[in-house]
Amino acid sequence: MKKQKRILFDKKNKFHFYYIWSVKNPKVWVHIIHGMSEHAVRYDELASELNKEDILVTADDHRGHGETGRSMKSLFHFSDSDGWSKIIKDQIDLISEQNIRCPLIILGHSLGSYMAMNVLQQIEKLKTNVKVSGLVLSGSGYESKWLYRINKLIAKIEIFRCGTRASSNILQKLSFESFNNNFSPTRTASDWLSRDENQVKKYVEDPLCGGAPSTKTWFDFMHGMNQIFNSRNLNLIDKKIPIHFISGDKDPVGKNGKGVVKFKNLLLDAGFKQVTLKLYPESRHELINDLDRDKVIADVKIWLRAILN
């Protein structure tokens, strides 16, 4: 079914855009949480494929992203204050607003994979009625708690030096600009995303993609990472929830597979019982936009059927 654009309003009557790809009698509900410097409409093909299996799909444009960011005149900037808390609350509010009565799976990509983990933690902390039946985490990874603390400090210094809403060359070099280093020759600064040149071209030409996040957004993200990997917060999550990692073994965000394995092992060591991982040879950061996307989507469908049966 064609996607429908919908709008939620916050207390200040600011627009929060989200999309729903509905089906008549949904067996499953997949809520997609997109990554940094992109937007929900990029998941249209994935949503349409899931619809074929009677899976209803929702996805929002986060604060600072897509139509939400454009309407707030704050592209690539979460908020002047408490940005991480706000984007997590937005997800919980959006999910809670829906009157959908079937098992809910959250599929988070990159930034969205970490948001998905924190959404689970906050659902438990706030004791909401939202029940999540599983997670699919795409384009994720883990480094170390001390590195996240250092990066948060660097972002704090850059806020002082450049301003809250400004971008930072230093933060860009430590993140997006470094991701292309393992690829040669390169056509664009975004070749690390996919081997599919047409998909990279679409991303580069999309005004709602690829912008440098603000210093405050980086600070908020690092604050979020420190929250997620806090052992007390990890223990809030039901250890029986199925969590499935998917990643390209040439994804720099996942350290070519090593960072994803590290994340998986961290969860297993924390007592999680159903953690699985699928690495795709030669694939890069955006699996659903890479050359193996048909295989990736088919595998996600198989995983969904398996856990729900």
What are these regions (language model features)?
Residues 78-97:
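Alpha/beta-hydrolase active-site loop
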Residues 270-309:
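Catalytic active-site module of serine/aspartate enzymes centered on a nucleophile-bearing elbow/loop
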Residues 108-112, 116:
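Gly/Ala-rich beta-loop-alpha elbow adjacent to hydrolase catalytic centers
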Residues 47-73:
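Conserved alpha/beta-hydrolase
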Residues 116-208:
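Alpha/beta-hydrolase-fold enzymes
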Residues 12-22:
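A short loop-to-beta-strand scaffold at the N-terminal edge of the catalytic core in hydrolase folds
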Residues 245-247:
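Short beta-strand/loop motif that positions the catalytic acidic residue
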Residues 34-38, 110, 249-250:
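Active-site glycine-rich loops that stabilize anionic/oxyanionic intermediates
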